């Protein structure tokens, strides 16, 4: 009874799968359902390049899975299955949230940052540390860094000067929604987390909003703020990694600093040999810091 389009087929099967979320209510049916509605939303949005179609049905279909998610959280919050449930849900929301823009704007980065910060703070909404929610901050952290690196280029900010203030049109609504999600989540998280406690990733939303406001006055100032924040974020991550004796976290901080420096060197018209020297120096820095942490571990073991 469908018209033969793929998105119609996926919609029908998604609706047929809804009952399996609660009878018998298996975890596999939840994973299948989330995957189906995400596929449907993507196909519906990209099915035509001539007309813009937004997958509005994706939103109520996503809401249907919330009771099943809460049930699995209470029953199997520390299980591997729930980890994958979280991972698929996070990926679905990350993809689905980007299907409601009419056009590409600088402000899209602000919306992505808002949602990314909310992802980073998801683990704080659970009192139990045994709940496996690692997929949310992982994806959120990637998105935060992606937006910061994107905004670290001077030319990106010139769109503010080219376009009038009302150029967003209908895109203002998904922008406001995603920003509101990030701001509300950040404010609610203050009950359990002080500003800049443990990680500085959530504060990136504040920095980006400040830089966006200042860009209307001075684009170079906005660019400097983003680059300075990237270096500070990387340095803090390195220090935290050393303090916690964590190689992955320390290397993440080194990577943030190195990528920021490398990107700025690509902006400069300098000799390729000098660029090569810089990359070698960055590699030596990675090696030195890793050897330092390993030595620190060895000394702690013999102490």
Question: Can you annotate each of these PLM segments?
Answer:
Residues 1-303:
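Alpha-helical multi-pass membrane segments and their bilayer interfacial helix-loop junctions
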């Amino acid at each position: 009874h469908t018209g033969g389009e793929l998105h119609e087929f996926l919609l029908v099967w998604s609706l047929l799968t809804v009952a399996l979320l609660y009878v018998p209510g298996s975890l596999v049916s939840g994973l299948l359902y989330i995957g189906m509605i995400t596929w449907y939303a993507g196909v519906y949005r990209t099915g035509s390049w001539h007309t813009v179609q937004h997958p509005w049905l994706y939103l109520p279909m996503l809401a249907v899975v919330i009771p099943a998610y809460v049930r699995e959280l209470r029953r199997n919050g520390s299980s591997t299955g729930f980890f994958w449930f979280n991972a698929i849900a996070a990926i679905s929301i990350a993809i689905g949230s980007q299907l409601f823009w009419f056009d590409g704007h600088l402000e899209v980065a602000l919306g992505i940052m808002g949602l990314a910060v909310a992802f980073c703070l998801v683990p704080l909404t659970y009192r139990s540390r045994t709940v496996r929610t690692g997929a949310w901050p992982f994806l959120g952290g990637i998105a935060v860094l992606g937006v910061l690196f994107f905004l670290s280029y001077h030319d990106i900010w010139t769109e503010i000067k080219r376009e009038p203030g009302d150029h967003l049109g209908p895109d203002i609504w998904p922008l406001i929604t995603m920003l509101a999600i990030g701001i509300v989540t950040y404010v609610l998280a203050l009950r359990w987390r002080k500003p800049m406690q443990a990680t500085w990733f959530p504060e990136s939303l504040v920095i980006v909003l400040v830089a966006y406001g200042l860009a209307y006055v001075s684009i170079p100032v906005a660019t400097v703020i983003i680059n300075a924040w990237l270096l500070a974020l990387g340095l803090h991550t390195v220090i935290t990694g050393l303090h916690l004796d964590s190689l992955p976290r320390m290397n993440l901080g080194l990577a943030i600093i190195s990528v920021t420096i490398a990107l700025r060197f690509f902006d400069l018209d300098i000799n390729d040999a000098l660029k090569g020297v810089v990359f070698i120096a960055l590699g030596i820095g990675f090696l030195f810091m890793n050897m330092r942490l390993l030595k620190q571990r060895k000394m702690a073991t013999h102490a």
